[in-house]
Amino acid sequence: MTALPSAYPEASSQMPAAAELACRMDAARLAEELSSVSVVSWQKQRTHVLGLDGESELGTTSPPTELEWRVLPLWSIGGDADRTDPGGPEDKGYAPTIWWSRLPCMREVVSAIPVPFNSVRLMALGPGASSDEHCDPKYDVRRGFCRLHIPVLTNPDAILVLDGVRYCWAPGELWYGDFSRLHRVENRGAEVRVHLVIDALMTSDLVQLFPARFRQSFEDHGALFNSFGLACADCRPWAHPRKFAIPRSFLNFTDDAPLETSEPKLSVELHYSDRNVYMKTVNGTVLAMTPVGDSRFRFSGWSDQRTVVVDDGSIVLESRFGHDRRTSRIFDQVDSDH
């Protein structure tokens, strides 16, 4: 995915692009466990559609890559073992796949990292495979996301080039990379390169594993730390669907500035049903929502970067990027039936 133009100041280039975190894994155990699923047919990597662009519907996935780049998902949207994409806002949240219970060492390793994780995937880059240079804007700590890598198998000729710097991370290490910057991967070796890739929500606890200079940089540039701990049952319910016309771009999750008032509007409904909260668009797309505060919700599969506050007679749309916070109050559309 290529970055879209942003209305926010560009600061990520001033932050370090990668860091080894203060956490080491048992590389031999990881490799041994990997061998137990090496005979399984891994599927090719796909990407996830994050925007309502008029052509591709939010929540759909791309065709499989032509590269020899295969995935075994351990956590995915709905726990679907066929989902090789990283996922995002959809009608359900993330859940373990059948492979999660069958790989106890990897389960232990991932669970020990102090983050709530979304997608967890084993990703295998075959010999001779190489990607085009690209960037993934989602994985910017100012958006509240981070992507972590634990190499399991590698070779000296299997590399990542991130922000112009060449990396070959060793098995058992835990690395953070700012994949919102330009990067590419290639494997010129004779052996497959396998990484355990964890897409997580940024937290203040995770930051403690970073080198000191990163911790200061995150503070300076407004890394977004997410909120947790509430259930929908803890929130004040509403009896009938709430109807609003919101900027269409608010549901384009590739857009860093989704609250422009000149944007075309999209009719949506907010539902509270059986202690579940979701947003439904006029074309039937359903997006599950998670509480992050009293009457404040984020989209499942997303971060606190984009939230909805439910008030009496209105909602407040919030968008954050680093230190920048933008809001827009939208009033209910009157429904004569209620």
Positions of the model-derived regions?
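Short, conserved beta-strand element in jelly-roll/cupin
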Residues: 124, 141-157
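Conserved short histidine dyad/triad with adjacent acidic residue
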Residues: 122-141
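Non-heme Fe(II)/2-oxoglutarate
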Residues: 1-109, 220
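A short beta-strand-loop-beta hairpin characteristic of the jelly-roll/cupin
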Residues: 151-170
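Beta-sheet ligand-binding and adhesion/scaffold domains
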Residues: 296-338
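A short hydrophobic beta-strand segment most commonly corresponding to one strand
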Residues: 146-151, 176, 190-207
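Contiguous, well-ordered beta-strand patches that form the walls/edges
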Residues: 275-308
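Short beta-strand His + acidic residue motifs that chelate non-heme Fe in jelly-roll/DSBH
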Residues: 132-133, 158-160, 177-178, 182-189
